[in-house]
Amino acid sequence: MGVCFTGSTKTAQAINRLMTQHLPPHIPLIAETGGLNAMIVDSTALLEQAVQDVIISAFQSAGQRCSALRMLYVQQDIAEDFKDMLFGAMRALCIGDPAEAACDIGPVINQASQKKITRYIQERHVLFATIAPETGCFIAPTVLSVTGIQDLPEEIFGPVLHFASFDIKDLDRVIRDINGCGFGLTFGFHSRIDERVQRVISQINVGNLYINRNQIGAVVGSQPFGGHGLSGTGPKAGGPRYVPRFAKQTLLQSAPCKPSKMKAAQVERAFQHQEQTAFSGSKPINLPGPTGELNQYHLTPRQRVLCLGPGAEQLAKRALALGCCAIAADISSEDLSAVPQLDAVVYSGPDARHIRKALSARDGAIVPLLMDETFEIWLMKERSVCIDTTAAGGNAALLAS
């Protein structure tokens, strides 16, 4: 049994709080909640392909996909050429009735959405916009100029793309900025330098990565879909852990051992100490896909796991064995709400409802309360990586014997 939801982060948080009042505390919420999805294009990318993928990712379905591209970074060496090609491609888009075969982009969902997006565009620096029909709930595909993802106040659910150029020496900073926004659903990267691709894959914190292709759409069994942080709780839809999350749980049994009392600041210091030697993850698993496409499934341990209850010490040892940063503590509800960042809480004991309520009152990402005897399964974050191997000159593995 569980609750499954797709929608906004705020609505997911509201559902989580209601669940603490009306359902047993061990019932999971599986939320998939969108995000500020970014793409980076470096100077080695095939511009024609990158432009096509940007058009599809940002404007298809009128930008009304949780996976849609919102923030585009282009290396400054090619930024002007890229903009010329992008704006030219946008001029060719047909906006109108989606029942017409020649139409590329239809309306947004309702007038309220149209008014909100229009007001947002009017308050910002427009680099380029097409022309939309005067009647109906249409929004012209628009590109806005920003300095980076930190300029985006929220997700704008429509055909609006934010554009910024960057110096390649600042690539690590750009990735930190993207990770720092708290969302982590989809991310795209266009580059023909494999070392750089692997570096970005290792640093970016999102659920679904797309290399040298568009970043919308996911195939069940090949690209399990779902985000991290403000973008979702996991497990991924279409992945091996989704259905088992709804199965009946065997709850943890308390052990006669009480952990040390700790304040929020002490818990934070303990996490920071463990993070210096945290395990980065296991070898990726190859998933099926067509020729010219490499699909990989990665499992990485959740970074900050707080273990509570009489058996917290044993629970923490089990979490540490997976590579998590795990702390066993006896902590008040007030201090539990004050710990800056938590990825999961594991608990065995009689106060589960109070703990679930304290966790639901936190701002930011939804923190799962794990009470299952096999809780280790849910301490691993899933990532899907999809690589178009044709973009870098073909699949070199085909040449190997």
Question: Where do the language-model regions lie?
Answer:
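ALDH superfamily catalytic-core signature
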Residues: 2, 9-149, 169-172, 211, ...
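Short beta-alpha connecting loops at secondary-structure transitions
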Residues: 36-40, 103, 161-163, 225-233
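A structural signal for short, well-ordered beta-strand elements
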Residues: 43, 164-168, 190
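Catalytic cores of nucleotide-enabled group-transfer and carboxylate-activating enzymes in metabolic
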Residues: 52, 59-60, 175-178, 195-205, ...
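Short, conserved phosphate/pyrophosphate- and ester-handling motifs at nucleotide-, phospho-/glycolipid
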Residues: 75, 159, 193
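Phosphate-coordination loops involved in phosphoryl transfer and adenosine-cofactor binding
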Residues: 96, 299-304
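Bilobed periplasmic-binding protein-like "clamshell/Venus-flytrap" ligand-binding domains
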Residues: 126-129, 183-190, 206-213
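Conserved glycine-rich beta-strand-loop-beta hairpin in the small C-terminal domain of fold type I
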Residues: 136-140, 154-161, 181-186
